[in-house]
C-alpha cells in the first residue's frame, strides 16, 4: 500500500511539474522576407548577398515547422519588408505579394503584420490599408480596444498601429515606425512636409539614404520616426497596461536601442521613444527587424531588445525565424539557423533603471 501511494504521489508530482513547464502561449517570428522573383545580388551597401527567390523557400520551411509544432503558435509576427523594393522595376509588386500571402494562407494561424520601408517602396498607404497586410482591420472587428489613429480613421495623416491581448495579462503593441517618413506619405500630406523638412535638416547629403558624415546616423530616408500624436497614443496604452499589471511586447520594423542595431537602422527619434518605453514597468520586450544581421541587448531598465535576422540575407543552407514560448516569469526563444536560442526573464519593476 505504501509503495502504491508513493508511486501515485511521484506520478502526481511529475504531471504537475510537466504542467508547470507548459507555456501560457507561443508565437512565431519572422523578419525581412523581401521576396522577389529575381537573381541573387549584393545589398545596398555591397556587404551581403540577398537571396531573393530563396526567401520564399525559407518562408515555406518556417510555415511547415510552425504547422507541425506540438504547441501550435497562437499567432505569427511578420516584422515588415515582406517583399523587396526591386519588384517595382518591372511592376511585379502585386504578384510578388500574392505569392508570399498564398504561402502564409496555408497556415491556419493569424499573421500580425508591421510595415517597413519596403512596403512603402512597393505600395501606398491607401493600398496597404485595404490589403491583407492590414492586420489591424481584423483586430478592430474582434477587439474594441484596438487603436487605429489619433482620429480613429485611416486617412492620409493616420498611423498604422494597434494592440491586442492573446492571453490574460499579456499585450502586444504594434507601432508605426514610418509615421513620419517621406517614403510613407503622399507628397500632398502635412506629415510628408514635416518628415522631408526634418530629414533635410538632419541629413545634408545628396543621397538621403547615406549616413556619411552625419552626427545622427539614423536620419536616412530608409528609416522613419514616431509622430507626437502616436507617442501620446502609445503612452496612453502603456499607462493603461501599467495599471492592469500587464506585460507588454512592443513590435516595430525599426529597432529603438543603439545596442540592438546599427545606429543607421534606428527610429529617427529613438531616444525619445526609448525613454518613454523604459518609464513604463509593463514593457518587457521590443521586437524588430530591419537590421538584417540581427542583434540583441537588455537595456539598463531590463527591457529585452530583439532584432531578428533578415530572411533575405540568410544563405540557403541556413534559416532565420523563431518561436517564442511565453511563461509566467520568462520568455524562451527557440531560434532556427541564424536566430539564437534565448531565455529572457522579465524585468523587475522594483529595480527599474532608465538609461540608454
UniProtKB/Swiss-Prot annotation:
Chain positions recorded as Zn(2+) 1 binding sites: 32, 34, 81, 292
PANTHER family found in the cross-reference section: MANGANESE-DEPENDENT ADP-RIBOSE_CDP-ALCOHOL DIPHOSPHATASE, PTHR16509
Superkingdom of source: Eukaryota
Cofactor(s) needed by this chain: Mg(2+)
Gene3D superfamilies on file: 3.60.21.10
Transmembrane segments: none
Range of residues in the leader sequence: none
The entry's keywords: Hydrolase, Metal-binding, Zinc
Role played: Hydrolyzes ADP-ribose, IDP-ribose, CDP-glycerol, CDP-choline and CDP-ethanolamine, but not other non-reducing ADP-sugars or CDP-glucose.
Family: Belongs to the ADPRibase-Mn family.
Keyword Metal-binding: yes
Phylogenetic classification of the source organism: Eukaryota, Metazoa, Chordata, Craniata, Vertebrata
GO molecular function, one term: manganese ion binding
Chain sites annotated for binding Zn(2+) 2: 81, 117, 253, 290
Enzyme Commission number, as recorded: 3.6.1.13, 3.6.1.16, 3.6.1.53
Catalytic activity: CDP-choline + H2O = phosphocholine + CMP + 2 H(+); ADP-D-ribose + H2O = D-ribose 5-phosphate + AMP + 2 H(+); CDP-glycerol + H2O = sn-glycerol 3-phosphate + CMP + 2 H(+)
Keyword Hydrolase belongs to the record: yes
Designated name of the protein: Manganese-dependent ADP-ribose/CDP-alcohol diphosphatase
SUPFAM superfamilies linked: Metallo-dependent phosphatases
Amino acid at each position: 500500500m505504501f509503495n502504491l501511494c508513493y508511486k501515485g504521489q511521484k506520478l502526481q508530482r511529475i504531471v504537475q511539474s510537466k504542467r508547470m513547464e507548459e507555456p501560457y502561449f507561443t508565437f512565431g517570428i519572422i523578419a525581412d522576407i523581401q521576396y522577389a522573383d529575381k537573381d541573387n545580388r549584393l545589398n545596398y551597401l555591397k556587404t551581403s548577398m540577398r537571396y531573393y527567390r530563396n526567401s520564399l523557400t525559407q518562408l515555406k520551411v518556417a510555415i511547415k515547422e510552425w504547422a507541425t509544432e506540438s504547441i501550435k503558435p497562437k499567432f505569427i509576427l511578420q516584422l515588415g519588408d515582406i517583399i523587396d523594393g526591386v519588384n517595382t522595376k518591372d511592376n511585379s509588386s502585386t504578384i510578388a505579394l500574392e505569392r508570399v500571402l498564398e504561402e502564409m494562407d496555408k497556415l491556419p494561424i493569424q499573421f500580425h503584420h508591421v510595415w517597413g520601408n519596403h512596403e512603402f517602396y512597393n505600395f501606398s498607404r491607401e493600398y496597404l490599408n485595404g490589403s491583407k497586410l492590414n492586420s489591424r482591420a481584423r483586430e478592430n472587428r474582434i477587439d474594441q480596444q484596438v487603436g487605429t489613429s489619433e482620429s480613429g480613421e485611416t486617412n492620409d495623416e493616420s498611423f498604422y498601429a494597434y494592440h491586442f491581448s492573446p492571453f490574460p495579462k499579456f499585450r502586444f503593441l504594434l507601432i508605426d515606425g514610418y509615421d513620419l517618413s517621406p517614403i510613407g506619405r503622399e507628397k500632398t500630406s502635412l506629415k510628408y512636409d514635416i518628415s522631408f523638412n526634418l530629414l533635410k535638416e538632419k541629413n545634408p547629403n545628396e543621397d538621403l539614404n547615406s549616413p556619411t558624415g552625419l552626427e545622427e546616423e539614423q536620419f536616412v530616408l530608409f528609416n522613419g520616426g514616431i509622430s507626437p500624436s502616436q507617442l501620446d497614443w502609445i503612452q496612453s496604452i502603456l499607462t493603461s497596461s501599467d495599471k492592469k499589471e500587464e506585460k507588454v511586447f512592443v513590435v516595430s520594423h525599426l529597432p529603438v536601442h543603439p545596442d540592438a542595431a546599427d545606429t543607421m537602422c534606428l527610429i529617427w527619434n529613438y531616444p525619445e521613444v526609448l525613454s518613454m518605453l523604459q518609464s513604463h514597468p509593463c514593457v518587457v520586450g521590443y521586437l524588430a527587424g530591419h537590421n538584417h544581421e540581427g542583434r540583441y541587448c537588455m537595456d539598463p531598465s531590463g527591457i529585452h531588445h530583439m532584432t531578428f535576422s533578415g530572411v533575405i540575407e540568410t544563405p540557403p543552407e541556413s534559416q532565420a525565424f523563431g518561436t517564442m514560448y511565453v511563461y509566467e516569469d520568462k520568455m524562451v526563444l527557440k531560434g532556427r539557423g541564424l536566430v539564437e536560442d534565448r531565455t529572457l526573464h522579465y524585468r523587475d519593476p522594483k529595480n527599474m533603471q532608465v538609461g540608454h
